[in-house]
């Protein structure tokens, strides 16, 4: 049975922020591509990072 990619990303919001921004910077054109590659719900990432007061900025392709 294949492991869900969600289990491969950090669950702690601050670690998730760092991981996500690094992936966006180095490998993906936008958040949608990142979420598709990791098979995770975009709304889940957005909500989790909003808990620590970060929002996705399309212009910079980062959570700021």
Language model regions located:
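N-terminal acidic leader/helix
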Residues: 1-25
């Amino acid at each position: 049975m294949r492991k869900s990619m969600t289990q491969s990303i950090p669950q702690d919001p601050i670690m998730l922020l760092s991981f996500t921004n690094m992936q966006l910077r180095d490998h993906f054109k936008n958040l949608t591509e990142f979420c598709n590659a990791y098979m995770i719900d975009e709304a889940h990432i957005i909500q989790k990072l909003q808990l620590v007061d970060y929002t996705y900025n399309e212009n910079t392709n980062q959570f700021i």
